[in-house]
C-alpha cells in the first residue's frame, strides 16, 4: 500500500488544503482525506455523505472545463442488457422533469461540450462537462433527478429496450417484428467482428460478469418489471459515487447532493466480487463468428491466450504488468510484434490483447487475428515467454527508458478534456473498491519503479512472467469466421420471433397493435418543456476567442502555456503536383513513413529513439476545402512534439523518414502493413458506417469530397483490398506498389509550398525552433517538384447512373446517408444551413428515425468547409424509411414544422457547444494553419450563426432541400426486392 504523504507545492493547492480540512463537514459530507498532486496541478478531496454513505471525489484544479458524474455499481444479473436499457430509460423523464427524454432535450438547452451516459461491464455512469457555471448547476440537477427519480414508464421500456410491433404500425395485417433502440444497437454491435470477439471472450473467461450491454438473443427475455427491480436495487445514494472536477466551488454541488439524498437512508450492500472462471488447468474455447469479406478464407480466425495475473487492487503490480504488456506488444521492436505479426503468423493483434484490470483480476492477453494455424501461434507465444526467462537481458533498457519518457510526457501534455479522462481512468477501479487516490499517485509509482529497475533490472519483469505465465494455466480462445454465421443469426432471430408470436392469443395481438398506435401518438405529442432549465442566447459571447499568431516567412508561431512542451506541425500543399492515379496511394505512403524503415535502420530502431526523445512523430494526408470557394486543398502533414530542450530530435526524425525511407529494401514490412490495414477494413465500417455512407454520397458533388472518398472512404478500403491481393505476386507487387510509393516520395518531399506552425511557451523557444526549421529545409530538395501536374480541382467526381447506392456488408443493420450541395464557408447561407441541420436533428429526425424507426442514431449535419448538407442514420433497421424521411424534410419544414424562436435559440446553443468547446494549447490557431480559416472569417460566421432567423431557415430549406432528391448511400445487407437496378447501384466488397 502506498502512503498518502503529500505536500502542496503551489498557492492554489495550499488554498485547497485549507479550504477542505480533514474532518470538516460540508452539507452533510465529511472530508475524509485530501491529497495534493503537484505534478498534475491538482488537489483531490475524498468525502462521504454521513446519512447515506455516498462517496464523493472532488478534483480541485484551475480548469474552467468543469466535470460532474454520478455512477452506480451495476453488476449485470444476466445478459438481457438490463443495466444498458436502464441507462437509456432513466433518461426518458423524471419526477421533476416529466418530459420525454430530458437528457436529449437538454442537449439544446445547454453549452455543455460533453454530455453522455455509459454502461461499463459492472458500473453505469452519467458524466457531463461545461465551462458555464449556471449550465453546470442546471445539468447537475437534471442528472440527479433523472437517475434517482426516473418515471420509467412502460412505453419508454418498449421504445428504448425491445417490443413486438407491426412493421407498419398502422396496418394490423403487416408482420410483427422486434423493435427497440438498444435491441438494434446491440444487433449492430455484433456485426462488428472485433466487438463480437471481445464480447464472447469476456463471457467465456468471465461468465459471472454477464453482458451488461445485452445480447440480442437474450434482450427479448427482459421484462419491464425486471427493469424496475434493477433500478430500485442499484440506483440508490448508498451505491452512488459522485465526482466533480474543475474550478467551481465544491460546496454548491455538496449542497445539492445533500438535498437530493435527504429522503434516503444508509443501505447495506453486499455486492459479491465477481470472479472469472477457475483457471486451474488449461482451457480452450472455440466458437464461430462473422466472416470478414475483405480477407482470404485462410485468414478468418482470431485467437488469443490469456493468463490471470493477480488483482488490480495491487496497484504497483498492476503497473508493472502494464509496462510488461507494453514491452511485449507495443511497437515494431516488441518481441510479440516481430514474432507474430512480422513473421506472418497473424495480421495484427486482436482487440483483447494487452493487460486488462477487470473487477477482481488482471488479465494478460496475447492475441492475433488472421491466424491460419492456432497451434503454431500457441507454440510461438509459449517459446517467447520461455526465452525471456532464459535470456540474461531480455529487454533493451532503452525501450524501458522510452516507456518512462512517454509516461512523463503524457503527464505534461495538456488536454482540453483532462477532467473527463481522469474520471475514465479512476471510475472502473473505484467502483470495485480500489482507492481512487492510488490512481493519482503517478509520481510515487514511477519513483518506486525507477528504484526497483536500478536494483533488479530485467528480473523485475522475469519474476512476473515466472509468477503468472510460464507453466501456469492458460485460457485459449478463438473464433473462426463462417460464411453461414450471419444467416444463423437471422435464422435464430426468426425462430425466436416465431416462438414469441406463437405464444400470443388474439387479444395479445390486438394489444400489440393498440400499443404501437399509442406509442406513436406519444412520440408525436407536442410537449411542454418549460420545466427544463435552459441557458439563453445572451449567454453566448458575441465575440469569439482570438489567438495571437506571429507569422514570419513560411512559419507561424503561437505562444501559450504549454507546460514546457513544444508542438511543431509541418505541411506541404500538394495541389496540381500529384498525378490522379497516385492519389489512392497517398494514405499508404503516409502510413509507410512511420512503419517501414530506412536504408540503414529498421523502423524498430527509429521508433525506440522517437519514444525516447519525443512525444511522438506522425504523418498524414488530408484534403480540406478553400473557405471562399470550396476548391480542394490537398495537404501532406507531418507533426511532432517534445520537451522544449529536445525539439532538435523532431527534425532529425522528420529528415530520416522523409528522405531515407526505403520502400524497396523494406518491401516485406510494407506487406505486413498492407495486411494489417486490410484486416481492419470491415471493423472500421462497422464502427462508423454512417460516416462512410456520408463520405460516399458527398463524393458525387465536389472534387474535395471525391478526393476524400479516395483517401478515406469505401474506395480506399477497396484499393487496400486490391493491393492485398497482389502480395503473393512479387513482380506485380514491386511494380504496382513499391514503385508507385517510391515515385510519390519524389513528388512529396520538396520545400516548395512547405509551411510550419510552432506552439510553445516562449518567444525564445519559438526562435530556436525557427532556426531548426531553416536547417531542416536545407536538407530537403527544393524546386524539384513544382505544381505542373493535373489540376487538383479537376479530380473526377464519383460518376453514377443513379442516385442510390447500396454497398453490401454482412451486417445485421444498416447505415444510411443522403447528401445535398451547400455553399462555401464564407457564404452567409452556410450559417442558416447549419442551424437548420440542427433543428431537423433535434426537432424532427430524432423522433422519426430513432424513436419511431428504431435506429440507434440519426440526424442531419452541415459541413461548413466542405459545403455539403447531409442526412444520416446509424444502426438502422429501416434504412429506406429513413431515406424517405430525409427526402421529405424540406416539405416538413415549410408545411408541418411549427418551429418558434425558442427552437431556433436552442439550435444555436447546441452549435456553440462545439464552437466554444475548450481547446488544448496545441490546438489553438491550428484551423487557420490547416484550412485557411482566419479569425475574422470565424468571427463573421459566429455573428451570422447568432443572427440566423426563422425566415432564413425557411428560405434555405426551400432553396437547398425542397424538391431536391440528393444522393443516397446505404451500407449493410441487401434489402430483398427493394435495392435493385435501375434505381439502385449495388456494390459488392
UniProtKB/Swiss-Prot annotation:
GO biological process per UniProt: mitochondrial protein processing; protein processing; proteolysis involved in protein catabolic process
Cofactor section: Zn(2+)
UniProt keyword Calcium, yes or no: no
A molecular function (GO) term: zinc ion binding
Major enzyme class: hydrolase
Binding site for Zn(2+): 84, 88, 185
Effect of residue 88 to Y: Loss of function
Activity regulation: Activated by nucleotides, including ATP, GTP, CTP, UTP, and ADP. Activated by copper, manganese, calcium and magnesium ions; copper and manganese restore activity following inactivation by EDTA (ethylenediaminetetraacetic acid). Inhibited by metal chelators including EDTA, EGTA (ethylene glycol bis(2-aminoethyl)tetraacetic acid), and 1,10-phenanthroline. Inhibited by copper, zinc, and iron ions. Also inhibited by dithiothreitol p-mercuribenzenesulfonic acid, N-ethylmaleimide, protoporphyrin, hemin, protamine and triarginine.
Knockout mutant characteristics: Decreases processing of mitochondrial precursor proteins. Impairs mitochondrial function; increases levels of reactive oxygen species (ROS) in cells, impairs oxygen consumption and decreases the membrane potential. Simultaneous disruption of the mitochondrial-processing peptidase subunit MAS1 or the mitochondrial peptidase OCT1 results in synthetic lethality in respiratory conditions. Decreases processing and activity of SOD2.
Protein name: Presequence protease, mitochondrial
Amino acid at each position: 500500500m502506498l502512503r498518502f504523504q503529500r505536500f502542496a507545492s503551489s498557492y492554489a493547492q495550499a488554498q485547497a488544503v485549507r479550504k477542505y480540512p480533514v474532518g470538516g463537514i460540508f452539507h452533510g459530507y465529511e472530508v475524509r482525506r485530501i491529497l495534493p498532486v503537484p505534478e498534475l496541478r491538482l488537489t483531490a478531496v475524498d468525502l462521504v455523505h454521513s446519512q447515506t454513505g455516498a462517496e464523493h471525489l472532488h478534483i480541485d484544479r484551475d480548469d474552467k472545463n468543469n466535470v460532474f458524474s454520478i455512477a452506480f455499481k451495476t453488476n449485470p444479473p444476466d445478459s438481457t442488457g438490463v443495466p444498458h436499457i436502464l441507462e437509456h430509460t432513466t433518461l426518458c423523464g423524471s419526477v421533476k422533469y416529466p418530459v420525454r427524454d430530458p437528457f436529449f432535450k437538454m442537449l439544446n438547452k445547454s453549452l455543455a461540450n460533453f454530455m453522455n451516459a455509459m454502461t461499463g461491464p459492472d458500473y453505469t455512469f452519467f458524466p457531463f462537462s461545461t465551462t458555464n457555471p449556471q449550465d453546470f448547476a442546471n445539468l447537475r440537477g437534471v442528472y440527479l433527478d433523472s437517475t434517482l427519480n426516473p418515471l420509467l414508464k412502460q412505453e419508454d421500456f418498449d421504445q428504448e429496450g425491445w417490443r413486438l410491433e407491426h412493421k407498419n404500425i398502422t396496418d394490423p395485417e403487416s408482420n410483427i417484428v422486434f423493435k427497440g433502440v438498444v435491441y438494434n444497437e446491440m444487433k449492430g454491435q455484433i456485426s462488428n467482428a472485433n466487438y463480437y470477439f471481445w464480447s464472447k471472450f469476456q463471457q467465456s473467461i468471465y461468465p459471472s460478469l454477464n453482458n451488461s450491454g445485452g445480447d440480442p438473443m437474450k434482450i427479448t427475455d427482459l421484462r419491464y418489471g425486471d427493469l424496475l427491480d434493477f433500478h430500485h436495487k442499484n440506483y440508490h445514494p448508498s451505491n452512488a459515487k459522485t465526482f466533480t472536477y474543475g474550478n467551481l466551488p465544491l460546496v454548491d454541488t455538496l449542497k445539492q447532493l445533500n438535498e437530493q439524498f435527504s429522503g434516503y437512508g444508509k443501505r447495506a450492500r453486499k455486492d459479491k466480487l465477481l470472479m472469472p472462471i477457475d483457471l486451474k488447468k488449461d482451457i480452450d474455447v472455440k466458437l464461430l463468428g462473422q466472416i470478414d469479406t475483405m480477407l482470404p478464407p485462410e485468414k478468418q480466425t482470431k485467437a488469443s491466450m490469456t493468463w490471470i495475473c493477480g488483482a488490480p487492487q495491487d496497484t504497483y503490480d498492476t503497473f508493472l504488468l502494464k509496462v510488461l504488456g507494453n514491452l511485449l506488444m507495443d511497437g515494431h521492436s516488441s518481441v510479440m510484434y516481430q514474432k507474430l505479426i512480422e513473421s506472418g503468423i497473424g495480421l495484427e493483434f486482436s482487440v483483447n490483447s494487452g493487460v486488462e484490470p477487470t473487477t477482481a483480476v488482471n488479465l494478460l492477453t496475447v492475441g492475433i487475428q488472421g491466424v491460419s494455424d492456432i497451434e503454431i501461434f500457441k507454440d510461438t507465444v509459449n517459446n517467447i515467454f520461455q526465452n525471456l526467462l532464459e535470456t540474461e537481458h531480455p529487454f533493451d533498457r532503452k525501450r524501458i527508458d522510452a516507456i518512462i519518457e512517454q509516461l512523463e510526457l503524457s503527464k505534461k501534455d495538456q488536454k482540453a478534456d483532462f477532467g473527463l479522462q481522469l474520471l475514465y481512468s479512476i471510475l472502473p477501479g473505484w467502483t470495485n473498491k480500489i482507492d481512487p487516490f492510488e490512481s493519482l499517485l503517478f509520481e510515487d509509482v514511477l519513483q518506486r519503479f525507477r528504484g526497483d529497475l536500478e536494483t533488479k533490472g530485467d528480473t523485475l519483469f522475469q519474476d512476473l512472467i515466472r509468477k503468472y505465465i510460464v507453466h501456469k494455466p492458460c485460457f485459449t480462445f478463438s473464433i473462426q469466421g463462417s460464411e453461414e454465421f450471419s444467416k444463423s443469426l437471422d435464422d435464430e432471430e426468426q425462430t425466436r420471433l416465431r416462438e414469441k408470436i406463437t405464444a400470443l392469443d388474439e387479444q395479445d395481438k390486438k394489444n400489440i397493435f393498440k400499443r404501437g398506435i399509442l406509442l406513436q401518438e406519444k412520440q408525436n405529442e407536442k410537449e411542454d418543456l418549460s420545466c427544463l432549465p435552459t441557458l439563453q442566447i445572451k449567454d453566448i459571447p458575441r465575440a469569439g476567442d482570438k489567438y495571437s499568431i506571429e507569422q514570419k516567412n513560411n512559419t507561424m508561431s503561437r505562444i501559450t502555456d504549454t507546460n514546457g512542451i513544444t508542438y511543431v506541425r509541418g505541411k506541404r500543399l500538394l495541389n496540381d503536383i500529384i498525378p490522379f492515379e497516385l492519389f489512392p496511394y497517398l494514405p499508404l505512403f503516409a502510413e509507410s513513413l512511420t512503419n517501414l524503415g530506412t536504408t540503414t535502420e529498421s523502423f524498430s530502431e527509429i521508433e525506440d529513439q522517437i519514444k525516447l526523445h519525443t512525444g511522438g512523430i506522425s504523418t498524414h494526408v488530408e484534403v480540406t476545402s478553400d473557405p471562399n470557394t470550396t476548391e480542394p486543398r490537398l495537404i501532406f502533414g507531418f507533426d511532432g512534439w517534445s520537451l522544449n530542450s529536445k525539439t532538435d530530435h523532431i527534425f532529425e526524425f522528420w529528415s530520416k523518414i522523409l528522405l531515407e525511407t526505403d520502400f524497396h529494401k523494406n518491401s516485406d514490412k510494407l506487406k505486413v502493413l498492407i495486411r494489417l490495414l486490410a484486416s481492419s477494413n470491415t471493423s472500421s465500417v462497422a464502427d462508423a458506417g454512417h460516416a462512410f455512407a456520408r463520405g460516399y454520397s458527398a463524393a458525387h458533388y465536389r472534387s474535395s469530397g471525391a478526393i476524400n472518398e479516395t483517401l478515406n472512404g469505401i474506395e480506399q478500403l477497396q484499393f487496400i483490398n486490391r493491393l492485398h491481393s497482389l502480395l503473393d505476386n512479387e513482380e506485380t507487387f514491386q511494380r504496382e506498389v513499391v514503385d508507385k510509393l517510391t515515385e510519390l516520395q519524389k513528388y512529396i518531399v520538396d520545400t516548395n509550398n512547405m509551411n510550419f506552425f510552432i506552439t510553445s511557451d516562449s518567444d525564445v523557444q519559438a526562435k530556436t525552433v525557427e532556426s531548426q526549421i531553416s536547417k531542416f529545409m536545407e536538407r530537403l530538395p527544393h524546386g524539384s517538384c513544382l505544381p505542373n501536374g493535373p489540376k487538383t480541382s479537376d479530380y473526377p467526381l464519383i460518376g453514377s447512373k443513379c442516385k442510390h447506392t447500396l454497398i453490401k456488408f454482412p451486417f445485421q443493420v444498416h447505415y444510411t446517408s443522403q447528401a445535398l450541395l451547400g455553399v462555401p464557408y464564407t457564404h452567409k447561407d452556410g450559417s442558416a444551413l447549419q442551424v437548420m441541420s440542427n433543428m431537423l436533428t433535434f426537432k424532427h429526425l430524432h423522433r422519426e428515425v430513432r424513436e419511431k424507426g428504431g435506429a440507434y442514431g440519426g440526424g442531419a449535419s452541415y459541413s461548413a468547409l466542405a459545403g455539403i448538407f447531409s442526412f444520416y442514420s446509424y444502426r438502422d433497421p429501416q434504412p429506406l424509411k429513413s431515406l424517405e424521411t430525409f427526402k421529405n424534410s424540406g416539405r416538413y419544414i415549410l408545411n408541418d414544422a411549427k418551429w418558434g424562436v425558442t427552437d431556433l435559440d436552442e439550435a444555436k446553443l447546441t452549435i456553440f457547444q462545439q464552437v466554444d468547446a475548450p481547446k488544448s494549447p496545441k490546438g489553438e490557431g491550428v484551423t487557420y494553419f490547416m484550412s485557411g480559416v482566419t479569425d475574422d472569417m470565424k468571427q463573421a460566421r459566429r455573428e451570422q450563426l447568432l443572427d440566423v432567423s426563422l425566415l432564413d431557415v425557411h428560405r434555405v430549406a426551400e432553396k437547398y432541400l425542397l424538391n431536391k432528391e440528393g444522393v443516397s448511400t446505404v451500407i449493410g445487407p441487401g434489402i430483398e426486392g427493394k435495392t435493385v437496378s435501375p434505381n439502385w447501384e449495388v456494390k459488392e466488397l
